[in-house]
Amino acid sequence: MASILEYLPGIPRSYWRDYVKAIEPTKPLVIPAGQRKVQLFPSDLTDKRGIVLQFAMNSNNPGITFYVVIDNRRIFANFTQLNDAGYTGYYIRDMPWLSEYNTTGNIYVVNLNTEIPFNNDVYAYVDNTTTSDAVIGSMGFHAIIFNKGFYKALADLKNGKE
């Protein structure tokens, strides 16, 4: 199955406004040195009707690990690292929620290729295993939640319907 992200650049922006909710921290986060589990987003921000498609983080610190917990199940502890110049296959530059990214550091992406319904909570965590505190800027980490309607709209678009 192809990644859902491969289709995003061709989707009219009205679909994004109607079906996509982007969440981001409002202030920089300081992650203390040592292995910690720091919750980045409170669970009440998640759309219970929806699914989690992607988490992205801009960081050049290899000692920082990001992971997601859905319904108490830890998933995707190993993020895919995209190099700064390429963004190959993900069309990062075409995604409006990443529009303020520059080319410093690395972009880490968790790509969930299939719909993952959830009944309870979704958490994004950070472990900092380095000996220094890490600061994540307020534009650094985004949670993008697509509701079920987005997938119907996407299917219609792929089938030639507007």
Question: What do the predicted segments below correspond to?
Answer:
Residues 2-162:
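Beta-strand-centric surfaces of beta-sandwich/beta-rich domains
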